Every structure is written in structure tokens, then in C-alpha cells.
């Protein structure tokens, strides 16, 4: 369709477009899905992706970074702005606050395990549980997850978490 043949736009145009798309999606996606449809996008997933792209756009990697000087589209326009914009951080912070507020309304929160001996937060077990426990096991920190079948279990068991595996945890 000619409408889709827009050519290369600037990074800022793309971020604004994605921001608007995720915001609109958050208005039409459901709060949750039944277990049968687990892993599908929800309102919180859309808001989380929105916050993440806005944080990236505000970061020094692309916000005023001179590394991208000379990256131009076919019309000769700069693809990345060379000017630092502090308002990008404000917009990202507002998106993160909106996500946190919506998540708390839905009963989401940090996964915390208290030490049985002194009642204080156990940072190791809290971190372990946040990354290794499912929602069914009491982890209400999960916003969006990747469902898996029982195929390829040995490969996944031996693959580090950073590469999509479970790093030796059988759960």
C-alpha cells in the first residue's frame, strides 16, 4: 500500500509513533488473559514496552549522542537528533510512573522474601524468586511472560538465562 511506503523517518518520529501505538494499545488490550491464553499481550505489557522505549530514547546512547552524526535518510535528513533533550527523561519518567500505578492497581508488586531469622528482606532469595518463580508460585511481579511447552527441556535446562534458557533450574 502506498500509505505504508513512507521512507526512512527520524528516530524521534519512530519513538513518537511507537509511544502513541503502545498508549492506544493499552486502552484496548485486556487486563489479563485466562491461563489458556497466557503470554499474550495485556494492558500492562503495552505500558511496559512504552516505558522501555521512552527510557531508551532518553538515554545518552541516542539523546544528544554525536556518534550518529551523519546518519541521514535518502532525503538527506538526519536520522538522529544531535541535541540533548531533558524533556525526554520527563516523558520516560511519566510513562514509568503510569506503568507502576497501573501495575499496583492490578495487584502487581515486587517479589519479596523475608529472612526467617530476622524478618528483614532476603535480597538473594527475593532476586531468585523474582526470576525463577511463576505467577502461580506467588510471583506477582510478572507483567508479561513467554509460555513454553515441554519440548526442548534439556536444551533449555543447559542454556544460560541470558540466552533464553533457565540456567539449570528445572522449573
Positions of PLM-derived features:
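Aromatic-anchored glycine-rich loop motif in surface-exposed flexible loops
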Residues: 1-43, 54-83
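An aromatic- and glycine-enriched ligand-binding surface/loop that stacks and positions planar moieties
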Residues: 43-44, 55-171
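TPR/Sel1-like alpha-solenoid repeat signature
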Residues: 47-53
Amino acid at each position: 500500500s502506498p500509505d505504508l511506503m513512507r521512507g526512512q523517518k527520524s528516530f524521534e518520529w519512530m519513538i513518537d509513533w511507537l509511544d502513541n501505538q503502545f498508549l492506544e494499545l493499552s486502552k484496548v488490550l485486556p487486563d489479563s488473559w485466562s491461563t489458556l491464553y497466557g503470554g499474550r499481550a495485556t494492558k500492562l505489557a503495552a505500558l511496559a514496552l512504552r516505558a522501555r522505549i521512552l527510557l531508551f530514547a532518553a538515554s545518552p546512547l541516542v539523546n544528544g549522542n554525536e556518534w550518529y552524526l551523519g546518519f541521514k535518510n535518502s532525503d538527506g535528513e538526519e536520522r538522529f537528533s544531535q541535541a540533548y533533550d531533558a524533556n525526554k527523561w520527563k516523558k520516560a519518567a511519566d510513562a514509568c510512573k503510569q506503568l507502576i500505578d497501573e501495575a499496583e492497581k492490578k495487584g502487581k508488586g515486587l517479589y519479596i522474601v523475608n529472612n526467617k531469622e530476622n524478618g528483614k528482606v532476603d535480597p538473594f532469595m527475593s532476586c531468585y524468586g523474582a526470576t525463577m518463580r511463576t505467577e502461580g508460585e506467588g510471583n506477582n511481579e510478572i507483567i508479561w511472560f513467554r509460555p513454553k511447552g515441554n519440548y526442548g527441556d534439556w536444551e533449555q535446562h543447559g542454556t544460560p538465562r541470558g540466552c533464553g534458557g533457565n540456567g539449570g533450574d528445572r522449573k
